[in-house]
């Protein structure tokens, strides 16, 4: 019997919607990354994108434990000399709440073209509204 290898054109991708309200950031991100990779499926193949599409709602209400709300710092560099910028978790939630979940999940995905393709299937929204109703997403309880 030969080993099964999933083909990109035969992979069935479902759409799921997840409510991040009150969920712990890291625990939510690990499950999202696992489902974006497709590791929950029997036909998982490491070099093929077998994951599903995931819509995350209420990104502004995600929880962190301890004092990370004030202590966790996000860094980025503008590319110019002395251009290192930083923002706390609280500032990130106030400015761009979607980015917090995106950064957490992106760090858990593979680096390279396959990881970028997986990351494109993640749709994060700060509120309860999304524009993917035509895809008929199923509610996923994490």
UniProtKB/Swiss-Prot annotation:
CDD domains per the UniProt record, alphabetical: Ribosomal_L13
UniProt GO cellular component terms: cytosolic large ribosomal subunit
Keywords for this protein: Ribonucleoprotein, Ribosomal protein
Source organism, top-level taxon: Bacteria
GO MF annotation list: mRNA binding; structural constituent of ribosome
PROSITE patterns: RIBOSOMAL_L13 (PS00783)
Subunit structure of this chain's protein: Part of the 50S ribosomal subunit.
Annotated function: This protein is one of the early assembly proteins of the 50S ribosomal subunit, although it is not seen to bind rRNA by itself. It is important during the early stages of 50S assembly.
Protein name: Large ribosomal subunit protein uL13
């Amino acid at each position: 019997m030969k080993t099964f290898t999933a083909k990109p054109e035969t992979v069935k991708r479902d759409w799921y919607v997840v409510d991040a309200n009150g969920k712990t950031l890291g625990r939510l991100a690990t499950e999202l990354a696992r489902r974006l990779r497709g590791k929950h499926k029997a036909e998982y193949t490491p070099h093929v994108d077998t994951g599903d599409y995931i819509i995350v709602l209420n990104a502004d209400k995600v929880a962190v434990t301890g004092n990370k709300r004030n202590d966790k710092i996000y860094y980025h560099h503008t590319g110019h000399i002395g251009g290192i910028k930083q923002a706390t978790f609280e500032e990130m939630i106030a400015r761009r709440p979607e980015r917090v979940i995106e950064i957490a999940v992106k760090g858990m995905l593979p680096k390279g073209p396959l990881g970028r393709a997986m990351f494109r299937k993640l749709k994060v929204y700060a509120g309860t509204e999304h524009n993917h109703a035509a895809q008929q997403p199923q509610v996923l309880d994490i």
